[in-house]
Amino acid sequence: MLRRLLERPCTLALLVGSQLAVMMYLSLGGFRSLSALFGRDQGPTFDYSHPRDVYSNLSHLPGAPVAAGASPAEALPFCPERSPFLVGPVSVSFSPVPSLAEIVERNPRVEPGGRYRPAGCEARSRTAIIVPHRAREHHLRLLLYHLHPFLQRQQLAYGIYVIHQAGNGMFNRAKLLNVGVREALRDEEWDCLFLHDVDLLPENDHNLYVCDPRGPRHVAVAMNKFGYSLPYPQYFGGVSALTPDQYLKMNGFPNEYWGWGGEDDDIATRVRLAGMKISRPPTSVGHYKMVKHRGDKGNEENPHRFDLLVRTQNSWTQDGMNSLTYQLLAKELGPLYTNITADIGTDPRGPRAPSGPRYPPGSSQAFRQEMLQRRPPARPGPLPTANHTAPHGSH
């Protein structure tokens, strides 16, 4: 009887339909969970149509700042977890470009080397902002103008490091960040390292420049370049935050990506291979505007990036902080930042003409081309047991 019932077409259709319904229900729930996991939830609501001036509330900050390295006469209470001076969305303007003298005048509390400590309370985080740089003076001034008041309202102890690549060779963003991390950690035991592109300006001071002890944070989740959304789940570009331990656990960033493209995906793969997970602020908080610019000479598209990405699983323990070499040419304490100039060498592979049409790096056409050429990441194997601690000593 049961056998004949199961053999009827209508019964089989009913069973198959029930299974599909259950699978769809579970899948929808799974996608909702993944959405929350990757930070695509909108989070709190902010009105970006009425931003505040980026220098709002600075006059309300208490007292004179504590000079870097100085000890207060008596123990101070910790600053609140969320500063009362935050204003939410702030206006970001690219014109006119302020002079360095104007920025210094607007930020009298900033100490030499771009250092700041809040007065009246002990900062909960000591954050080093590390900016790779070459031939982007206007972008750098815009970043300094917006970032200093932004960070002061968050009541952080911070320092800004600008890492300048000497010479005219191909630009290497990731290697410059490794240089900046090493030099910054020689100055102070920073709690948090913010790796920050020079052309990205934050639009919401609720986007706190602090690290997540659970794992690396990707902070620039909603750029105007991508329509204020995450371009793909593994994206780790623009602005990211790691504790020194997290940075060393993944052996820092790769040194072999000369030119534009590829290093962000290598870094995201390193996070996974080191047994960590990426966290993100809500989309409504992690807003950034990118300063418009043309393609940079010396930062052309990297034709080797896909070959390098295929090897990341096997190369990440050998290419990074433990293989970093450079010559420190200058380390100067300017009024708004610590300037580090380094000779990081040149691409040993030399130039190679990329296949297909060439678009300006960072353009929408270049991004689409990269998505079409992107190879699927290799499956992660067992984690290596190598010692990931960067050696101390010579460069």
Swiss-Prot record:
Known catalytic reactions: an N-acetyl-beta-D-glucosaminyl derivative + UDP-alpha-D-galactose = a beta-D-galactosyl-(1->4)-N-acetyl-beta-D-glucosaminyl derivative + UDP + H(+); N-acetyl-D-glucosamine + UDP-alpha-D-galactose = beta-D-galactosyl-(1->4)-N-acetyl-D-glucosamine + UDP + H(+); a beta-D-GlcNAc-(1->3)-beta-D-Gal-(1->4)-beta-D-Glc-(1<->1)-Cer(d18:1(4E)) + UDP-alpha-D-galactose = a neolactoside nLc4Cer(d18:1(4E)) + UDP + H(+); a beta-D-glucosylceramide + UDP-alpha-D-galactose = a beta-D-galactosyl-(1->4)-beta-D-glucosyl-(1<->1)-ceramide + UDP + H(+)
All ranges on the Cytoplasmic side of the membrane: 1-10
Q: Which Pfam families match?
A: Glyco_transf_7C (PF02709), Glyco_transf_7N (PF13733)
All disulfide bonds of the chain are C79-C121, C192-C211
Keywords of this entry: Disulfide bond, Glycoprotein, Glycosyltransferase, Golgi apparatus, Lipid metabolism, Manganese, Membrane, Metal-binding, Signal-anchor, Transferase, Transmembrane, Transmembrane helix
Q: Which residues form a coiled coil?
A: none
Cofactor(s) this protein cannot do without: Mn(2+)
Q: Which residues are glycosylated?
A: N57, N339, N387
Which InterPro entries would you find in this protein's record?
Galactosyl_T, Galactosyl_T_C, Galactosyl_T_N, Nucleotide-diphossugar_trans
* Pathway where this protein functions: Protein modification; protein glycosylation
Quick one: which residues bind N-acetyl-D-glucosamine?
Answer: G262, E263, D264, D265, R305
Q: Which residues cross the membrane?
A: 11-31
**Which segments carry the region annotation Disordered?**
341-395
Any idea what this protein is called?
A: Beta-1,4-galactosyltransferase 3
Organism this protein belongs to: Cricetulus griseus (Chinese hamster)
**Could you tell me the gene encoding this protein?**
B4GALT3
